[in-house]
Amino acid sequence: MYRSTKGASKARRDQINAEIRNLKELLPLAEADKVRLSYLHIMSLACIYTRKGVFFAGGTPLAGPTGLLSAQELEDIVAALPGFLLVFTAEGKLLYLSESVSEHLGHSMVDLVAQGDSIYDIIDPADHLTVRQQLTMPSALDADRLFRCRFNTSKSLRRQSSGNKLVLIRGRFHAHPPGAYWAGNPVFTAFCAPLEPRPRPGPGPGPGPGPASLFLAMFQSRHAKDLALLDVSESVLIYLGFERSELLCKSWYGLLHPEDLAQASSQHYRLLAESGDIQAEMVVRLQAKHGGWTWIYCMLYSEGPEGPFTANNYPISDTEAWSLRQQLNSEDTQAAYVLGTPAVLPSFSENVFSQEQCSNPLFTPSLGTPRSASFPRAPELGVISTPEELPQPSKELDFSYLPFPARPEPSLQADLSKDLVCTPPYTPHQPGGCAFLFSLHEPFQTHLPPPSSSLQEQLTPSTVTFSEQLTPSSATFPDPLTSSLQGQLTESSARSFEDQLTPCTSSFPDQLLPSTATFPEPLGSPAHEQLTPPSTAFQAHLNSPSQTFPEQLSPNPTKTYFAQEGCSFLYEKLPPSPSSPGNGDCTLLALAQLRGPLSVDVPLVPEGLLTPEASPVKQSFFHYTEKEQNEIDRLIQQISQLAQGVDRPFSAEAGTGGLEPLGGLEPLNPNLSLSGAGPPVLSLDLKPWKCQELDFLVDPDNLFLEETPVEDIFMDLSTPDPNGEWGSGDPEAEVPGGTLSPCNNLSPEDHSFLEDLATYETAFETGVSTFPYEGFADELHQLQSQVQDSFHEDGSGGEPTF
């Protein structure tokens, strides 16, 4: 093995550098670009051109004549395109980048490629995931893919446009040439069109087709500030089927799908409210002449502070529409989170146009435009001569004010079949009407109550909502901008908020929730009036038509009041939002209240029981029937009575009516020397117990309780002497009468029955004692089987322990 020396290392480096310089000379670049290339850039460009040469050399030769256009003519066509061509593999490795990229991104092709040989090196990191998803999405090779991403631009271009450039990419995968490398890396060819349109050359009357239509399906249109069509390119005939003359001076909102009105109006408002170089993007559906709907990716931008809007409309497929809409929604949510502003739909709350300015024929919607009957009167037409007369939107728009639709007057009820001649957002702010005039199609008119229906027909107990209870038919809501809103909420306005605002928006922002609606300050509201429950307040307002809205329900526009009753069920159906009440007035996702204590059914007997009687197990655990339980209780009572009679001395004078215990005996002195032959009697406080007749044990003809039977049963027990001495006396001498007890005449079967009763165990005791538990000691509750025959002086019995 040869040891490396300083001279040998320098020689190898010189050889490598010489080979790199040879590669630089082989690159098809201008000499000015070659001079400023570093060794790393040279090797990167060499890899790109090598992949390009291998791919195009191994591809399928083109069929047909190839001599129609020369190479120079092809280069001129590519340079004239409103975009640049891009070829890269599925893993992102670049194969080709047209020279026209310098006009759109500010970088030359050499500068962009010098950053790396992958497309991810020249794309904004925030869009890497979008591009990767599009490249890995499974589909046919000939299926077009359309997506948008941001390309890195030069410093000078970023200073002009304050950011990277948004580019719309449409391309497809091609069949790969033979080879293991190309089998796993199909080639994607795309045309990239910047979404920042270039100024149109020449003072032409309308937008021309442009070279972009050769690679991208699109048509251009110009709109007034109300989005009425001023001009449109002829290519609209291909995509929508309308002639150019059929769309001039028509409302753009008349072509929109009803579900896309909210998105279009919010972007339209943003263009009007914000100043500067603002562009709006939206994915909407436009109605074609044959009646179908076509997905359009629309890019709107303003030509000047007072000039009209220009729109680039790109027809897209359903899959592309879904992908673009998801991308736009995620970007809007991200921007709202960064800026700290809620992503809600704005609304106009002031008069944008006067009644005289609405007479321009540009505001007339096309046939089939939705209509509305929520406004008291139709606007009068005026004239708009120049764009300079169009008023600017106010910078102080109040979004907390929630207007309520008023009842249509008879003058408008007769003309419900006519189209209203206003398009949002330049709609006259009618008193009591919604901010935008989104007219309804015929199917949506079913939400409107008939003008001739009465209040009893419209308000039934099943249809009365919380919003109706809080807004009686006679309530007045003075408008802070116009005073004509007072006294407008009539009988036909007893609809829910959803029915009133359905044509305006597809989703309700937090400000439009029924329980958080804000109302303007009334001019004269009664004071010291309490908020009653909705069920009683609504009936009270029905009975008093002249009553105005209470002060508690009509705060100033800057405050928000939450109803204390009836709103918890509304919030339980809605997800919590940042503006949801959390101060105790309303309950967010309240849990059901559990009544009574919780109990757990234990399947086994708990361990560690001291005694069976102290067991906390429920009685239902053993599943006794009522009859069995009664029998057990009766047997326990009889056994306890027999045990009481055995442990306690009886009176010498036994009456014929039953057993009478001695209740006046004095306890024995424990210090006495007890040496008698008979068993001692413990000094216990005797309590009077009542005994039950045991007639069921003997023949009914014999009176069992006439004598004292206990002394006859226990013949061997001695009775204490009154002097305190024990002796073995004869029971006949001590018992008056000296007659034997009838118990001596019992049959052997009766004696056996009595013995069984004395040793009987209940089912509960048997079940518990059968299974000993851990920590369970029989000595804790078992009685002594033998009576002590002697006691010590200290009163203790038995043998000494030590």
UniProtKB/Swiss-Prot annotation:
Main localization of the protein described in the UniProt heading: nucleus
Classification via InterPro entries: bHLH_dom, bHLH_NPAS4, PAS, PAS-like_dom_sf, PAS_fold_3
Region called Helix-loop-helix motif, residue ranges: 14-53
Pfam families (alphabetical): bHLH_NPAS4, PAS_3
Bias kind Polar residues: ranges: 470-495, 502-518, 532-554
Any GO BP annotation: learning
Induction text: Induced upon calcium influx. Expression is regulated by neuronal activity (at protein level). Induced in CA3 region of the hippocampus after contextual learning. Induced following sensory input in newborn olfactory bulb interneurons. Induced in the medial prefrontal cortex cells of the brain following experiences with positive valence. Induced in pancreatic beta cells in response to calcium influx. Down-regulated by REST. Transcripts are regulated by a subset of miRNAs, such as miR-203, miR-224 and miR-744, that bind to its 3'-UTR region and down-regulate its expression.
Post-translational changes noted in the entry: Ubiquitinated, leading to degradation by the proteosome.
SMART domains registered for this protein in UniProt: PAS (SM00091)
Ranges for domain PAS: 70-144, 203-275
Tissue distribution of the protein: Mainly expressed in brain. Expressed in the limbic system and olfactory bulb. Specifically expressed in CA1 and CA3 region of the hippocampus after contextual learning (at protein level). Also expressed in pancreatic beta cells.
Region of interest (Basic motif), ranges: 1-13
Effect of disrupting the coding gene: Mice appear anxious and hyperactive, are prone to seizures and have a shortened lifespan compared with their wild-type littermates. Mice show learning and memory deficits: while having intact memories 5 minutes after training, memory is significantly reduced one hour or 24 hours following training, suggesting that both short-term memory and long-term memory are impaired.
Localization (cell): Nucleus
Region named Disordered: 470-554
Residue runs in coiled coils: 5-38, 624-648
Protein keywords: Activator, Coiled coil, Differentiation, DNA-binding, Neurogenesis, Nucleus, Repeat, Transcription, Transcription regulation, Ubl conjugation
Domain bHLH, chain residue ranges per copy: 1-53
Membrane-spanning residues: none
A GO MF term: RNA polymerase II transcription regulatory region sequence-specific DNA binding
Domain (PAC) ranges: 280-319
GO cellular component, one term: transcription regulator complex
Subunit structure: Efficient DNA binding requires dimerization with another bHLH protein. Heterodimer; forms a heterodimer with ARNT, ARNT2 or BMAL1.
Entries under PANTHER family matching the protein: HYPOXIA-INDUCIBLE FACTOR 1 ALPHA, NEURONAL PAS DOMAIN-CONTAINING PROTEIN 4
Protein task: Transcription factor expressed in neurons of the brain that regulates the excitatory-inhibitory balance within neural circuits and is required for contextual memory in the hippocampus. Plays a key role in the structural and functional plasticity of neurons.
Protein name per Swiss-Prot or TrEMBL: Neuronal PAS domain-containing protein 4
Organism: Mus musculus
Organism placement in taxonomy: Eukaryota, Metazoa, Chordata, Craniata, Vertebrata
